[in-house]
Each structure stands twice: as structure tokens, then as C-alpha cells.
Amino acid sequence: MSRIRLPLILSGALLAIQLVASAYQAPVKVNRGEYFPARDNWERRKPADVGMDAAKLHAAVEFMKSHETAAPARDFSDQEIIFGKLLGSIPAERGATNGLIIRQGYIVAEFGDTERPDPTYSVAKSMLSTVAGIALDRGLIPNLDDPIANVVEDGGYDSPHNRLVTWRHHLQQESEWEGEMWGKNANFLGKEAFGGAEMKPRPIQAPGSFYEYNDVRINRFALSLLRLFKKPIPDVFRDEVMNPIGASTTWKWVPNPVKASGEW
């Protein structure tokens, strides 16, 4: 297995989580009634009101504030070194360390600018798997073990090898799909294209037999879902998931303006 991209995370986040966990005390009975946070009105509580130790919670927050990650760089100057040739736009800089601690639906701690939108890379995989679930529920995907070539006819699954790729393979990152997306090959070879994430040559395995964390194949999966819905996947996610659950409206999926060989 190989991992080629890590999401934006706080350095030392695991230790911080341990600190927060240690701040938890015995449950305190609170007469909360029926409560579900509104989109822009999450209620706040003191740590003691939800069974947390205020001093330990404060220590956890201070730890996180003082352990900002060094990667990516604030100005994203290291992105091509890490990931290779960039596709699409990227902000001039990222925000500083920030976060929320929520218990029982209430905000008990907040630090930094939590309303600033910042790039979050691998969250796309969770988004796409959710959209795939909607497609399955609607019957757009009859069966997760069906070959994608049965319903997607854009040339991306025409080869004998790719015709074996199923929806489950993409969802489990075991597709071994062969091809290019926006000028980047799924084999992840080449320093210019992939930077420090480039891989060593290896034999391609049968779909479903080898796991690989591979962004090119995730992009192919996203395009295949678009073919089913016949509209941008971010629109599907907004209309079917984010708006119904009352999520914030500040998020966005930044489109890729690059036109290159391999764009089906």
C-alpha cells in the first residue's frame, strides 16, 4: 500500500485528542430537552456543564495553538515539491491553526479563525463515497459489484483491463484503473507530475486485488459519478447532503480549469 497525499492536519493532533479525552469526567445530568444545532447558531456551554474538566480542556487547546503544522507552508510554496504539477487554483496562503471542540452538540472551546475556508484535500473521498451512496439509493448504480463500463460509456473503461473495474473497486481504492486524467497518469511516475509523491514502477494488478491511495483514480471515480448524475458532483452534494442537514454555505469545490489529454 502507499499513501500519496495527506490532508491538512494539525501537528500533534493525536496528542491533543488524548488531552481532550483526559478532560472528560463522569457524565453530568443536564436538562437539555430536544436540541439540534441550527446552521449558524451552535449553542455554547461551559466545560463543567457537559462533564469536562475546564483546566485540562484549556491545556489541550493551548497545546494545539502552540503546535501549528509546518506543512503545508503558509504560502503553499511547497505544494509542487510535495505533489508535483498543480492542477487548478490554490489560495495565496492558508490560515493559522484553529479549531472547535464540541460535546453533545455544544461548543465548549474555540480558537483561531474557524470560519476561514481552507483547502482540505482528502475530504473529497468522503464526499464522493457519500454521493455514490446516493447514486446507489436512486438506482443509478444498480449494484456496487457491477462493472462501471455497464453504465459509463465515455472511453474511460473501454480497455479489457478497465472493463473489469467496479464501483466497489473505486470506493475501496482497489480499482487499478489505467489511464490519464488532466495530463497525469494513474501510474504516478515522474517527478515533474507528482513531486515527492511519485511512485516506483510496479506491475499493474487485477482490479480488486491491490489497494493504492491514488488521486488520479479518485478523479476518474468523480468523473464517473458525474456521468451518472449528468451535473456537477458538488451540486449534487450541496442539494442532497449539505443543504438538507443545515451545513454552512461557505464551502466550495474549486473547479479545475486545466484542459489536457486524458480529460474524457
State what each model feature region is:
Residues 42-43, 201-207, 217-219, 255-263:
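Flexible glycine/proline-enriched surface loops and loop-helix/loop-strand junctions
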Residues 106-108, 114-115, 177-178, 218, ...:
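Solvent-exposed loop/turn segments at secondary-structure junctions
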Residues 121, 211-213:
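Catalytic tyrosine of NAD(P)H-dependent dehydrogenase/reductases that use a Tyr as the general acid/base
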Residues 138-176, 229-264:
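Active-site helix/loop module of the DD-peptidase/beta-lactamase fold
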Residues 155-184, 199-209, 216-219:
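Conserved catalytic neighborhood of penicillin-recognizing serine enzymes
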